Amino acid sequence: MSNTPIELKGSNFTLSVLHLNDGSPKVIRQAISDKIAQAPQFLKNAPVVINVSAIADQTIDFKKLRRIVEDAGLRVVGISGSHDAQQKEAIIAAQLPILNEGKITKPAAQANNDKTNEVPINVRQKTKIIHTPVRSGQRIYAPNSDLVVLSNVSAGAELIADGNVHIYGVLRGRVLAGASGDQESHIFCTHLSAELVSIAGQYWLSDQIPTDFVGKSVQLSLQENELTIENLI
């Protein structure tokens, strides 16, 4: 046990990003309520980052925006997509964190030098294999590895892997592949009836899955940052 009362450590979490395309409070509230109703177990009280890049030209009351989103059933972690200094001041005044998205560009010489000193951080681990049914309320995570389930996955269960996910049975729960952001990850399933499928943060709720593939043996992947699905057999 540590001798210090608290420890502050870095970690990684997968968060959903709520992209706002309309600044109307009434529209936002109704849209969030409708979305949560589609998958309440997954989305109710879920932490989200609000991206305001699409409505950057509008005047936003961030205190009111936070209240609207949280009253609708989500929990606001921070704001992203803001590039205007005055708007950022308004976000800070609303006591909301500003989260920056994107990559840091390094000078070529520094980048080349970094490559010579690269050390793998996330070493792929041995595949995690589950032989028993996954029941409602269960949550299985395979960090830095693939996840294989050799049985059925009930509604309300959740499978998460940093790599690929294979389900050799009926999938009625939720599955998230590429949880750490690996866009090359796939989902393979012999009978798709999922509440939610997600790869590297891109997801479909049950009503967004093309009906032609429901109940079928399928694989899902990302193409140009969009989910795609095709039959396995």
Curated annotation (Swiss-Prot):
Signal peptide coordinates: none
InterPro entries the UniProt entry points to: CAP/MinC_C, MinC, MinC_C_sf, MinC_N, Septum_form_inhib_MinC_C
Top-level taxon of the source organism: Bacteria
The keyword Repeat appears for this protein: no
GO BP annotations, alphabetical order: cell morphogenesis; division septum assembly; regulation of cell division; regulation of cell septum assembly
Record's keyword terms, sorted: Cell cycle, Cell division, Septation
4Fe-4S listed as a keyword: no
Function according to Swiss-Prot or TrEMBL: Cell division inhibitor that blocks the formation of polar Z ring septums. Rapidly oscillates between the poles of the cell to destabilize FtsZ filaments that have formed before they mature into polar Z rings. Prevents FtsZ polymerization.
Self-association state and partner proteins as the record states: Interacts with MinD and FtsZ.
Family: Belongs to the MinC family.
NCBIfam families for the chain: minC
Protein's name according to its UniProt entry: Probable septum site-determining protein MinC
Species for this entry: Proteus mirabilis (strain HI4320)
Gene from which this protein is expressed: minC
